[in-house]
């Protein structure tokens, strides 16, 4: 989930890769398998792209429609919202040596990141990225992200609450057979969507871009 800026208006959009059977992570997520069993397949299409590599401090890489989709995903982002499951493994209290993210000393975000959790924790700064841990719900997290801008359950909550402006789904030609579904549960019925764009890639990935119908209420 990211708060992007267009002109002077902050917009909330989510961008995610999804399997043909609707999963955004494989089963049995763990420290050894942070994306779940088979979940890495959802993101392999992006790893060799020039925009992805540049965001991780690397040179070279491929261009084309997939790269354009990643570039659009990363443009004009002022802040990011994620669930605890995207930040790291486990639940409950953080412990004496709390997890500091999957990304090492230089996370690729370069902007404030707001992590939804039930357990308080001091703000963590890694490189150019700050992680603030929000314990009072999705609306306060959105307010903080919007001010700063000037995972599946999180996307569902914001979408069901009518707070999402746009979404881009990268449909990957694989079946995972289990894991975390993007759209799972009640509360999404009746949400209007306007198709903005559908882009077919030679790699087999289909990039779907939608706007939600109507004005978002804060």
Predicted regions and their residues:
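Enzymes that bind and transform nitrogen-containing heteroaromatic metabolites
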Residues: 2-218
